[in-house]
Structure formats: C-alpha cells, structure tokens
UniProtKB/Swiss-Prot annotation:
Belongs to the heme oxygenase HugZ/HutZ family. GO terms for molecular function: coenzyme F420 binding; metal ion binding; oxidoreductase activity, acting on the CH-CH group of donors. This is Probable heme oxygenase HI_0854. Involved in heme iron utilization. Catalyzes the degradation of heme to biliverdin, with the release of iron and carbon monoxide. PANTHER family: HEME OXYGENASE HI_0854-RELATED. Keywords: Heme, Iron, Metal-binding, Oxidoreductase. Its EC number is 1.14.99.-. InterPro entries: DUF2470, F420H2_bilvrd_red/Heme_oxyg, Haem_oxidase_HugZ-like_sf, Haem_oxygenase_HugZ, Pyridox_Oxase_N, Split_barrel_FMN-bd. Heme binds at H247. It comes from Haemophilus influenzae (strain ATCC 51907 / DSM 11121 / KW20 / Rd). It is an enzyme of class 1 (oxidoreductase). Gene3D superfamilies: Electron Transport, Fmn-binding Protein, Chain A, PNP-oxidase-like. The keyword Cell inner membrane does not apply.
Amino acid sequence: MDFNRIITHMNDHHQDDMAVLCKKFGGEKEITDVTLVNVDFAGLDFKYNGGKTLRVEFPQQADAGSIKQVIINLCVENKPVANYDRIKAKIDEFRQEFKSCVLSTLDKDGLPMASYAPIIFFDGKYYIYISAIAEHYENLKRNPNQVEVMFLEDENKAKSIIVRTRLRYKASARFIPREDPIVEKVLDKLAETMNDVGGIKTIREFTDFDLVELTFGTGRFVRGFGQAYLIDANGEISHIGVKGNPHEKESDK
C-alpha cells in the first residue's frame, strides 16, 4: 500500500477538508499551514498552526481496499452542517429501522429503571404494548411525564463500539382505554410487523396488557465524534460543539 500517494493527494487537493478535521478534532477556531504527515490503516496524522500535531483515528480499522472510502467518509461526515434537513432525514431513517425501543422510567422510590418494549408507528404516532406485570408499567402509570426513549444501533452494525449511533427523546406516556378503536388498529399493525407470529396472536387477547401512546419531546442524536445534535420540542436541529471538538484531551487540562 502506497500511503505516500494518499499524503500527496490530500496535501495537494484537500486543504479545506483537512482544516475542518483539525478544527473539529483539535478544538481550534482557526487553522493555518495544515499538512498531512502520515497515514496508516488506523488514522491520519496532521501538523498545523506552526507545528501542532493531531492524530485523527478512523471510526474503524481500514485496509487497502477500504481506506480511500474511509477517508472520504471521514471528511464528508465532518463538514460543517449548512442544511439540517439532511440530518433530520437521517434521524427519521434511523428511528424507522427499529421495532423496539429502550425505556428509562422512574420506580416508586424515584430511581431510574431501564427496560425495553416493542414500539409501533401508526398514523403519525408511536405506541408501546406492555404487560401490567412488567416493572415499567407501574412506573409509567406513576410518572407518565418522566420517561426517556432511546434507539441504539446494534453493536454488530456499529463502526466502533464507542460511537454507536443513538437517538434519545424525553417523552410522555398516555394509556389508551381498551375500548378505544385505535387499540385494535395499532395491534393489527404490530401483528403485520411481526408477520403474525412471535406470540402477538396470544398477547393481544390478554386483558392485562395495555396500549400506551408515547409523545416525544426534546432529544439528542449522536452519529459519532463531533456529530451530536440537539432536537428541540418542535423537531428543529442544532449542532452541539460547533466551535471545535467538545471533548477535553489530557493535554488541554
């Protein structure tokens, strides 16, 4: 593998991209005299601003066949966001991948409890179908406005175990009366999602299960280092740490 060709190409044609990486991962407001000095399958080494050095690790180990695309992705994904519509689309796409969600609720002593439940998207709203004997059932009854919902990327799909994509919302819960027609419609949707197997035929007849509507409020979406976004109550997006890398390094203390 001729790493020198990559170094020459980046230094000749991608000064702006390298400056963006140094700003974000080096926590700098201004970048001058940026040079790529070394490349390997784990990351890039830069010099900038009169001799400062910076190592930017790839999200996952590259090889001879993938290193070009890994560098392209690193540069593209860390460009300053000019239009948040693309991020909104990523959030919607990510959320729609899931058939279950992680729940954080408060128990009777006010302590947080983590659990999960199947989640159903129907007619623009989100629902969970839960048993009265589940711990989170009483937690939701007791504290319906103190709930968090998280969608977390599968470890096996993540580029790195420390940068799993995740989407989290503060939420409120509303129990739907069993006689409400929406209950059967949502359960039909759940049965369709599960191909009418996996126990749905049985549990939809249980009277100790309830349908709960979840209303999402503010949230946070994280795709990787320097790619964290706040979601306001209206669904508008803002970038966290826009003035450089928000993480403190040992040398910064």
